[in-house]
Amino acid sequence: MSFGHGRLQTETPFAAIINGRIIGIAYIRKSDYYPLPEIYPWVSGIFVTESYRGHRISEKLISFANEYAKEKGFDKTYIPSVHTGLYEKYGYRYLGDIVNYANETDRLYVKEI
């Protein structure tokens, strides 16, 4: 498995690739689906193909994204989610509830990197 990233001005995508197939993705974004311009960078868009779930791919993608953010001079990252208990195992702590542009409530997590 290999991990790669592309460079964009407002977001940087990361992909987990096996045998030339993308099996997982994550992004570092300057902004996300929330009216919170003072909070960034976001680790978001985390997805792993169902057949590869349970193999710690998302953990590796998040770690890779955090290392990239750290190299860029950031000391923390944020993850928005509806899940409870998922990102805590990756070192994130619950910061509070946030409301997205669709007026839906999500949980905001932060991690010192």
Predicted stretch roles:
Residues G6, I28-L36, G45-V48, I62:
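Portal/gating segments that form or line small-molecule/metal binding sites
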Residues E71, D75, S81-T105:
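Conserved active-site alpha-helix within GNAT-family acetyltransferase domains
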Residues E11, E104-L108:
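Short hydrophobic/aromatic beta-strand or adjacent loop that forms the aromatic wall/cage
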Residues I17-N19, K111-I113:
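Active-site beta-strand termini and strand-to-loop segments that position acidic
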Residues G45-V48, G54-E67, I79:
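Conserved acetyl-CoA-binding loop-helix of GNAT-fold acetyltransferases
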Residues P13-A15, R21-S31, W42, F47:
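Conserved beta-strand in the GNAT
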Residues M1-I17:
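Active-site rim helix/loop that mediates acceptor-substrate recognition in acyltransferases
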